[in-house]
């Protein structure tokens, strides 16, 4: 299906508000390095290599705004910017939105700074899906048996054919975003797709490759080092 919106702009919010708690590090995880560069720079460079006209907004934890500016400024284009985030993920997203003027036909992508391995072709597919469906997310399937537990014991087994693991970016078309912004938010949503679902809007799914890892723990950082060479072959 051809896009109805031919003059769209693409905006990318990269959420980099981590403090290193789950990583068990005094250094926020987005500043930890693999392959000789901080995670955040790997992610930023990935989006800068995407040959689309876009504006990138880096949303940083307020305590680390100067570090973010120092590390990232050399990799930002003139239209890009760095702003302080909020107290929650959703609050940070709203802060990022405040820096933008989004029209109905535009596309907004929201991405975790700790996911440096998204593929450019996935970004293209995601945008196509957003144009057609309004809201979309990357997600991946599992080949594992999926169970639910209660008090540390198996409670039930879930049908993995209908189980997807949410990834990012998640994205939304401007007209749908404008509608969501007029609605009450109770409870505070954890991400874009849960926000949309509370308003009765379902997100379409674009399958992501299995290495679209969110670096959260020390073991993930070790995996990222290993994945880095492999990822170059997937590009």
UniProtKB/Swiss-Prot annotation:
The keyword Nucleotidyltransferase applies. It is an enzyme of class 2 (transferase). It catalyses: 2-C-methyl-D-erythritol 4-phosphate + CTP + H(+) = 4-CDP-2-C-methyl-D-erythritol + diphosphate. The lineage of its organism: Bacteria, Pseudomonadati, Spirochaetota, Spirochaetia, Leptospirales. The gene is ispD. The record marks 22, 29 as: Transition state stabilizer. This is 2-C-methyl-D-erythritol 4-phosphate cytidylyltransferase. It holds the Pfam family IspD. Pathway: Isoprenoid biosynthesis; isopentenyl diphosphate biosynthesis via DXP pathway; isopentenyl diphosphate from 1-deoxy-D-xylulose 5-phosphate: step 2/6. Its EC number is 2.7.7.60. Keywords: Isoprene biosynthesis, Nucleotidyltransferase, Transferase. One of its GO terms (cellular component) is cytosol.
């Amino acid at each position: 299906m051809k896009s109805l919106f031919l003059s769209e702009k693409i905006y990318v919010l990269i959420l980099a508000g981590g403090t290193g708690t789950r990583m068990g590090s005094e250094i926020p995880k987005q500043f930890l390095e693999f392959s000789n560069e901080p995670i955040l720079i790997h992610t930023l460079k990935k989006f800068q290599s995407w040959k689309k006209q876009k504006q990138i907004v880096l949303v940083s934890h307020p305590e680390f705004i100067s570090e973010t500016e120092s590390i990232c400024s050399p990799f930002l284009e003139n239209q890009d910017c760095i702003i302080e985030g909020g107290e929650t993920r959703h609050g940070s997203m709203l802060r990022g939105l405040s820096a933008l003027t989004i029209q109905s036909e535009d596309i907004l992508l929201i991405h975790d700074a700790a996911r440096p391995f998204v593929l450019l072709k996935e970004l293209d597919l995601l945008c196509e899906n957003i144009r057609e469906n309004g809201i979309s997310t990357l997600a991946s399937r599992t080949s594992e048996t999926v169970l639910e537990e209660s008090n540390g014991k198996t409670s039930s087994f879930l049908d993995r054919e209908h189980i997807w693991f949410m990834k990012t970016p998640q994205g939304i078309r401007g007209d749908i975003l404008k509608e969501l912004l007029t609605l009450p938010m109770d409870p505070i949503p954890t991400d874009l797709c849960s926000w949309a679902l509370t308003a009765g809007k379902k997100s379409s799914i674009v399958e992501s490759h299995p290495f679209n890892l969110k670096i959260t723990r020390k073991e993930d950082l070790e995996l990222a080092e290993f994945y880095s060479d492999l990822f170059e072959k997937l590009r």
